[in-house]
Amino acid sequence: MPDVTLTTLQGLKQSGEKIAMLTCYDATFAHTASQAGVDVLLVGDSLGMVLQGHDSTLPVSNEEMAYHTACVKRGNKGSLIVTDLAFESSHSVAQTLADAVRLMQAGAHMVKLEGGVWLAEPIARLAQMGVPVCAHLGLTPQAVNLFGGFKVQGRQETQARQLRADAIALEQAGAAMLLLECVPSVLAEEITQAVKIPVIGIGAGAATDGQVLVMHDMLGLSLTGRSPKFVKDFMQGQESIPAAIAAYVRAVKDVSFPAAEHGFNA
């Protein structure tokens, strides 16, 4: 199979084939996931919680993100690599640009930024530099303290209207992809139809252009013993991790995942 590129993802959106995305933090899992057909590997700052044991993503440094990106790059066999910019990267546009360059040098094909319309300037600057950006809207974990916890976003009409406007504005600024987290399924469908760029969902229903889960969640691994509503344990009924990942890819592609039970109402 040829390497997955941004052009590949754009083609999948146009054809209606769903995009399978999964978090990944090391070479072995990168090799396993890419061989199983995962289109996009997300080196997420979720590593702060599932690998480091923190209660949020805030303590993760950009240097740690670069380290794990390099690990994933060495094991990857053709998937597109997207890496989160750490929380510390957001205090100035100059810092965001410098840290994005560091992640691209480490092996990322795209960087991900959490936030709203205020990201238009750094996204535009990065696009001018040739750095593809995935904008992350809805429940943005780096803003967990502002939200008062990990809560569904966009249920109130004012919130929903702002999310729609943010999505369009960030596409116009140059965002190449969009991730929607924990928003009502109907709103996610509206946003997916309103923009031309690929839209990936997590807890956002089945109408987005693709799905992403945290690797540990979909393998049934948890420090707390509890999983978010939008998670399905794909290890159930499978004899190996590669088989579970392949089952996840199939379920995303044939739209059997997510089911209605994994989404949120307005």
Swiss-Prot record:
The record's remark on the cofactor is: Binds 1 Mg(2+) ion per subunit.
Q: Does the keyword Metal-binding apply?
A: yes
Q: Please provide one cellular component term from the Gene Ontology annotations of this protein.
A: cytoplasm
Q: What is its EC number?
A: 2.1.2.11
* Function as written in the Swiss-Prot or TrEMBL entry: Catalyzes the reversible reaction in which hydroxymethyl group from 5,10-methylenetetrahydrofolate is transferred onto alpha-ketoisovalerate to form ketopantoate.
Subunit structure, interactors included: Homodecamer; pentamer of dimers.
User: What is the designated name of this protein?
Assistant: 3-methyl-2-oxobutanoate hydroxymethyltransferase 2
Encoding gene, per UniProt annotation = panB2
